[in-house]
């Protein structure tokens, strides 16, 4: 069995310029590393039937055939590095500076993958025979559209009747120090684009036109003032943010025919995406009708909110983290969405939690 150093492995992973949707060889490399440890690896490539997204490589690897199956979920894709000149090092040529590993994906989340693989290698050297199974679910589509990634792997596993009993999503989680926090849930996310249609005209003759901007401003004001809820013991209050307003009108003396606004809602488990769609549509419909404008709303749901109630296994993980780090992690649902949303909605898993 090979000796796997987590820092060395993290550096090797960072060298792959796997900016979504490009894999750049990262998944095949991981498969080779896991096979050396005895894992049965399956590379799964998915593509969108409508060809709106590019094919994505994923991997599901398992060691053992019995339950319980402890799964580590993560992703090898990274966000674009931006201008290379703005980096102190080449983002895909990792370097250590002042005790920090610098490179694209060092934090989110190639180092996490490397650490878990290294931990598994050390565990297997001590206990080659153990009760249950260890598995990895790694995608190359988390930072992008997330269409051909974890969700489709989970669907594949359901078809194969492959059961995951406990899943750790290794995303960066702690605000300051390792061991501070365990994510036991996440808020949902829904984005929307509101189009308001009036009638074009000259500003000198406003009575001959219908300004959609006025209607859109009133809608944005109403949405901004509307309090969705006060939160609960597990979640902070749901929040709606107007993210853009656009008229596409360069003439200062012309009343435009249409106006557009975009928004995003991060919502807790007091709502569903369906209930929020109805609420938003109702507000837009009432104000549009009042001003005799037509409207159109397009919604995109990134994920529903979910909560895993702390059980015996999660409390055990908390105790282990405290023993190793000397810090008692808090249970939290703060922050953005993650692929835990895809795992949590299946019958594959009991709890879904998130630890780094």
Over which residues does each language-model region extend?
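Metal-dependent amide/peptide-bond hydrolase catalytic core
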Residues: 1, 173-177, 184, 190-348
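A structural signal for isolated positions on well-ordered beta-strands in alpha/beta enzyme cores
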Residues: 42, 71, 135-137, 296
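Residue-level recognition of beta-strand->loop/alpha-helix junctions
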Residues: 45, 138, 299-301
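Fold-level recognition of mixed alpha/beta catalytic cores in primary-metabolism enzymes, strongest
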Residues: 111-222
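Single conserved hydrophobic/aromatic residue that forms the stacking wall/gate
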Residues: 347-356
């Amino acid at each position: 069995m090979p000796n796997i150093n987590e820092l060395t492995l993290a550096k090797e992973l960072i060298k792959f310029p796997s900016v979504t949707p490009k894999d750049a060889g990262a998944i095949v490399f991981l498969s080779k590393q896991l096979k050396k440890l005895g894992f049965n690896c399956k590379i799964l490539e998915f593509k969108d039937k409508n060809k709106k997204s590019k094919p994505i490589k994923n991997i599901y690897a398992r060691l053992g055939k019995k339950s319980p199956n402890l799964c580590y979920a993560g992703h090898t894709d990274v966000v674009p590095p931006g201008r290379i000149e703005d980096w102190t090092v080449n983002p895909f040529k990792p370097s250590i500076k002042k005790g920090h590993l610098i490179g694209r994906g060092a934090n989110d989340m190639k180092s996490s993958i490397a650490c878990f693989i290294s931990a598994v290698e050390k565990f297997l050297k001590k206990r080659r025979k153990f009760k249950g199974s260890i598995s990895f679910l790694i995608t190359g589509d988390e930072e992008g559209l997330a269409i051909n990634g974890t969700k489709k792997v989970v669907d594949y596993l359901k078809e194969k009747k492959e059961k995951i009993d406990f899943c750790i999503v290794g995303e960066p989680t702690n605000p300051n120090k390792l061991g501070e926090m365990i994510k036991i849930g996440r808020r949902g996310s829904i984005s929307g684009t509101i189009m308001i249609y009036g009638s074009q005209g000259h500003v000198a003759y406003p009575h001959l036109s219908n300004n959609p901007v006025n209607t859109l401003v009133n809608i944005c004001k109403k949405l901004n003032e509307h309090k969705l809820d006060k939160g609960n013991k597990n979640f902070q209050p749901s929040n709606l943010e107007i993210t853009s307003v656009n008229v596409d009108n360069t003439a200062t003396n012309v009343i435009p025919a249409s106006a557009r606004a975009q928004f995003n809602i991060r919502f807790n488990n007091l709502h569903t995406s369906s209930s929020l769609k109805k609420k938003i549509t109702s507000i837009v419909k009432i104000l549009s009708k009042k001003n005799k404008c037509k409207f159109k709303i397009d919604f995109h749901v990134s994920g529903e909110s979910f909560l895993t109630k702390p059980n015996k296994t999660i409390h055990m993980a908390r105790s282990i983290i405290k023993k190793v780090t000397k810090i008692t992690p808090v249970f939290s649902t703060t922050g953005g969405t993650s692929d835990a949303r895809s795992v949590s909605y299946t019958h594959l898993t009991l709890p879904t939690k998130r630890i780094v």
